[in-house]
Amino acid sequence: MKVVKKVLGENINNEIIQFLRTHGGIGIPFNHKKYKIIKASKKQNDTIDLGYVGEVDKILTKELKLSLKKDLIPVIAPIGQDRKKQFLNINADVVAGEVAQAL
């Protein structure tokens, strides 16, 4: 999970924000550090333990809506957190769909 947080939550997140800035947009990072908007639980599999793979339980929209009202572009890393504060890697397409549905 350390590598996932570094690559998705920091490196790629920052690259996208830089890209947006280069093209006139202002991105705001929603990652595992500041805005923990993805509440998740560990994904269950009957055959094997999937490790730190999660599924979305809930998207917290308050901070997302505030940033959108300020014309900021949310850049969301697909990293959720469970009830025990454990970080979980979630499929980015699933996160995008859940965010769209929650908004």
Predicted segments, located by residue:
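Nucleotide/pyrophosphate-binding catalytic subdomain
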Residues: M1-L103
